[in-house]
Amino acid sequence: MLDYLNIRRDLHQIPEIGLEEYKTHAYLMQVIDGLTAGLDFVEIRTWRTGILVFIKGSSPDKTIGWRTDIDGLPIVEDTGLDFASTHEGRMHACGHDMHMTVALGLLEQAVSTQPTHNLLFLFQPAEENEAGGMLMYEDGAFGDWLPDEFYGLHVRPDLKVGDIATNRGTLFAGTCEVKLTFKGKGGHAAFPHEANDALVAASYFITQVQTIVSRNVDPIEGAVVTFGSLHAGTTNNVIAETAFLHGTIRTLTQEMNLLTQKRLREIAEGLAQSFGLELDLELKQGGYLPVENHPDLADELMDFFQKEEGVQLIDIEPAMTGEDFGYLLSKVKGVMFWLGVDSPYALHHPKMTPDEAALPFAIEKIGKFLDYKINER
């Protein structure tokens, strides 16, 4: 039997950012090879740093998929753990080390005997930065292994161990990264009439884009437009020639995301024209679509866990966090859910430390659900 704690702690020490998960890939392959050696009903494929493990059913009518992400974040860890990151400036601050450990535990259970239906395990790279699920899908990595149903989880620090939370609709927001540069003309602060101040235009832009949420978005639906970074100028008495802004759009429907992108572009172009500035605008959504659960499959999953002893099932509201599993769920029906890990620190925090008691709980309970799915008639 796998030692879940050691696996999680090993993985926690080697976080790597998207499409650079080389040590992680090697570690996972070593464990997977050990679990599947000599099994003629298991096949393995790789795609860059991603791994696909296909368990062929004895008389399959469908393929069930389980997806986990494997990348870390560019964060300096501050947990003080004995098994803290050994990679400088990298951390598993989003719990993907927990996700991988759960997936390996589920794989161990799944290969103990050949199931009736097919089961695919996807160890997906680059969730955080490059929408690895979309890259794999578009590159044909799944081939004829593409599931009929896809399932996955994400740890959640503000939920307790034993909590599983999901809903029958949108669970995560769709996100769009925004990069924007206004370019004017620099000059001496004493002679503003001889310059064209990009910083003034950027200031107007920051306030004007807030009207998208207040005046263009259905208040029942909601949206987020946040700019967390603004860089302009070099010193106090020089007018800024350029101003760079970096932000995000988050919405619960793709239609609203596209509307928000449209309005942001119109405001930026209008301000650039009115101030006589050049504009460089990049809107990058990629594969970060809203995570939309399939209502019938969500009903089935929620009913299953509602009846499972030791599980506290929560019908939860959507969150404005983003997840590239939304892209795969736009291609394959499925369900994502939260797994409680009871940490006082939020996801992406340098002190985020999940409760490892969630590992055996998740592997046992989710294992029962997958066993039901791959052996049902």
Swiss-Prot record:
InterPro entries: AcetylDAP_deacetylase, Amidohydrolase, Bact_exopeptidase_dim_dom, Peptidase_M20, Peptidase_M20_dimer. The active site is at residues 69, 128. One of its GO terms (molecular function) is N-acetyldiaminopimelate deacetylase activity. Coiled coil: none annotated. It catalyses: N-acetyl-(2S,6S)-2,6-diaminopimelate + H2O = (2S,6S)-2,6-diaminopimelate + acetate. GO terms for biological process: diaminopimelate biosynthetic process; lysine biosynthetic process via diaminopimelate. Keywords: Amino-acid biosynthesis, Diaminopimelate biosynthesis, Hydrolase, Lysine biosynthesis. Catalyzes the conversion of N-acetyl-diaminopimelate to diaminopimelate and acetate. NCBIfam families: amidohydrolases (TIGR01891). This is N-acetyldiaminopimelate deacetylase. It comes from Streptococcus sanguinis (strain SK36). The lineage of its organism: Bacteria, Bacillati, Bacillota, Bacilli, Lactobacillales.
